[in-house]
Each structure stands twice: as C-alpha cells, then as structure tokens.
Amino acid sequence: MSRRGTAEKKTAKSDPIYRNRLVNMLVNRILKHGKKSLAYQIIYRAVKKIQQKTETNPLSVLRQAIRGVTPDIAVKSRRVGGSTHQVPIEIGSTQGKALAIRWLLAASRKRPGRNMAFKLSSELVDAAKGSGDAIRKKEETHKMAEANRAFAHFR
C-alpha cells in the first residue's frame, strides 16, 4: 500500500482583466519563451478585434468557438500483437478544451495575415460560425474515430 497521498488537481486561474479561465488557458498556450506579457497583449488585441468584427460579447464568441472545436472522441495508437491500431477513446472536458485551444492556435498560426492577434481573432470568429481549419481538424478526428470503431474493444 502506497504511503504517498494523491496529487491535487491544479485548477486554471483566471486572467486579470476578464476574470475568465479560458482566456488564461489561451494565454498559457500561446506563450513562447516565457514572454507572458506579450501573450496577454496578443490575446487582448484579438479580443478587441472580435468585438469590432462581431459587435457582440467577445467572450461568448470565444466560448462558442472553443465549444465548437472541442472533440468528443479521438484516436490513440495501441500496439496489439505486433500491429498498431488506432483505438477510439472518449475525451474528458478538460482534455477536450486543451486540444481545442491547441488546434485553434495551430490553425491561426497557419493563416496568412498581418499579426497573430489578427489571425487569432479571424480563426475564433470562423470557429464560432462553424467553419475554419480548427473545425475541419475536429471533423477529421471524429471521422478517424468512426472509421476505427472496430478496434474500440482494445481499450
């Protein structure tokens, strides 16, 4: 029997301006080389651009975009008897949000445009509308999981 206690789950803190955990998760994922103030600048500029484009609450657009991109199911490689199978697994809400944020940032980095704030705002607006690269990535993942449903018993 182990003497070590169970580790506490860390909860995501909220950002200083909007008091929103999703914004802070975005900031931590966009962060490069420890430049958190630059990451905050990029996110806040993107939020302002969303406000200008949609003329609605930018945080609701952000929530809607992340909800639209969050996958329910994904595939994981599993080696069984010398061959590797793509096994579909269900994803929890926290892991799903993390994946969605990663996909949104990757899609916005690929976009052509002036700066990261502009590209991120465009990607978030598109994702909220149900289009864009991040949504395509989610649908692709769901198709992969559906195609490999036969291997679901390998979990």
Swiss-Prot record:
Gene3D superfamilies in alphabetical order: Ribosomal protein S7 domain (1.10.455.10)
Any one Gene Ontology cellular component term annotated for this protein: chloroplast
Example of a GO MF term: structural constituent of ribosome
Biological-process GO terms, alphabetical: translation
Principal location class: plastid
Keywords of the record: Chloroplast, Plastid, Ribonucleoprotein, Ribosomal protein, RNA-binding, rRNA-binding
Keyword 4Fe-4S: no
Subcellular location: Plastid, Chloroplast
InterPro entries: Ribosomal_uS7 (IPR000235), Ribosomal_uS7_bac/org-type (IPR005717), Ribosomal_uS7_CS (IPR020606), Ribosomal_uS7_dom (IPR023798), Ribosomal_uS7_dom_sf (IPR036823)
Assembly notes: Part of the 30S ribosomal subunit.
Homology family: Belongs to the universal ribosomal protein uS7 family.
General function of this protein: One of the primary rRNA binding proteins, it binds directly to 16S rRNA where it nucleates assembly of the head domain of the 30S subunit.
Protein name: Small ribosomal subunit protein uS7cz/uS7cy
Organism listed in the record: Lemna minor
Species classification: Eukaryota, Viridiplantae, Streptophyta, Embryophyta, Tracheophyta
